[in-house]
């Protein structure tokens, strides 16, 4: 509306703090001065996806003042520093129809809150960049900051690439390839830019500092516009948004919302001596990873059984039914009980899959032991032995049994 002024989105600030904590930002060091002081600025440039001619962003006092991300890579651990992360209003979306002499502008996402993470130049290969992007995707979801759905553009990646001759200390001129929406695109765009820039340097040509796009069909980057330096954006404080102090209370509230993070789960799966590759598949799905963690909290002995089902049969069931595991009746208590029945010999591995498939639906009543008996899934045994098995399973999970009897799933 004409004359409308911007208003800071409180929820965006809260979610940015949650992700900032997951990125390793040290907010505690600002506590003695009352908290972290942040402000907003105008970034001035002309482009069709920015109708106002400027973007509200943060220049020198961002909401995430730094941090670092550590993740497994090629048998070791890779560390990438976080320069900063700042809140800003998103720009529109440009699309370039193949073979046409025009572009289309979609402004539906314009001015929606965006947190831009700026990384240190710590990556040395396209594969490292891809692994780092995957870990950022994990952290965005585990922190509760975003569902980070790549298909819908809820998380996008800009890849900065420069090359330099062996032995040269200074970085070369960089390009920025914008708005990549898949991990594969991150890797392929970086590979293409490296090849392109090496050819230029080896032929004595200069690499232009520019913003580039990614053509998925051709698997090539293409020039979009020259890349400005910071002073060319003519930053100045946003007059319509007052500065803000991120107080220790706000930080404490954000910490309460951030639960387990990927490296916490890596430590747990490593302690349980689980295969690293399968553990990474589990960790890539926060809902499944949380179920695994809670299952192991109930019964540590079920770590391997729970992992096997969550990265195996569960994936098939989720695809077949369209039901996410967290919406099914396969709770940690159910998974632990089924695992105990398998370990105790009363249930075969094949029948355990059938039993868990029975529970892979909303609001399934009864305990696994009761369902197994009703469906004749238990190993053949006389009635006395069967009663002992059922009693042992129920006694081992007395609280879970009480919850079922009370009607709680």
Over which residues does each language-model region extend?
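Generic recognition of stable, solvent-exposed alpha-helical segments in well-folded globular domains
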Residues: 11-15, 128-131, 185-189, 260, ...
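Core structural elements
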Residues: 153-165, 270-293, 301-321, 333-335, ...
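Short acidic alpha-helix initiation/capping motifs at coil-to-helix transition points
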Residues: 256-273, 283-288, 329-334, 346-347, ...
């Amino acid at each position: 509306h004409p004359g409308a002024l911007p208003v800071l989105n409180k929820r965006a600030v809260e979610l940015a703090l949650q992700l900032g904590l997951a990125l390793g930002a040290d907010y505690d060091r600002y506590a003695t001065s009352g908290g972290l002081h942040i402000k907003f600025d105008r970034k001035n440039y002309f482009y069709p996806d920015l109708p106002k001619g400027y973007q509200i962003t943060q220049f020198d006092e961002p909401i995430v003042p730094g941090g670092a991300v550590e993740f497994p890579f090629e048998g070791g651990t890779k560390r990438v520093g976080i320069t900063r992360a700042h809140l800003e209003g998103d720009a529109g979306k440009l699309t370039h129809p193949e073979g046409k002499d025009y572009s289309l502008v979609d402004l539906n996402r314009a001015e929606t809150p965006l947190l831009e993470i700026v990384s240190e130049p710590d990556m040395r290969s396209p594969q490292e960049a891809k692994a780092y992007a995957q870990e950022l995707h994990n952290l965005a979801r585990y922190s509760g900051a975003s569902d980070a759905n790549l298909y819908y553009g809820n998380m996008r990646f800009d890849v900065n690439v420069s090359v330099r001759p062996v032995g040269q200390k200074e970085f070369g001129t960089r390009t920025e390839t914008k708005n990549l929406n898949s991990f594969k695109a991150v890797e392929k765009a970086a590979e293409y830019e490296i090849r392109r820039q090496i050819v230029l340097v080896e032929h004595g040509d200069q690499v232009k500092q520019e913003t580039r796009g990614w053509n998925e069909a051709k698997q090539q980057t293409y020039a979009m516009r020259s890349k400005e330096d910071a002073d060319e954006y003519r930053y100045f404080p946003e007059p319509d948004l007052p500065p803000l102090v991120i107080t220790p209370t706000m930080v404490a509230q954000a910490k309460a919302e951030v639960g387990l993070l990927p490296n916490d789960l890596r430590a747990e799966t490593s302690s349980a001596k689980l295969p690293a590759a399968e553990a990474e598949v589990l960790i890539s799905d926060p809902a499944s990873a949380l179920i695994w963690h809670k299952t192991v909290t109930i019964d540590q002995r079920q770590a391997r059984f729970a992992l096997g089902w969550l990265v195996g049969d569960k994936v098939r069931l989720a695809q077949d039914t369209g039901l996410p595991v967290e919406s099914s009746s396969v709770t940690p208590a159910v998974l632990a009980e089924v695992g105990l029945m398998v370990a105790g010999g009363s249930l075969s591995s094949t029948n355990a899959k059938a039993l868990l498939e029975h529970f892979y639906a909303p609001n399934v009543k009864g305990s696994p032991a009761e369902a197994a008996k009703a469906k004749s899934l238990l190993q053949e045994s006389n009635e006395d032995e069967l009663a002992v098995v059922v009693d042992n399973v129920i006694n081992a999970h007395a609280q879970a049994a009480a919850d079922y009897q009370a009607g709680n799933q």
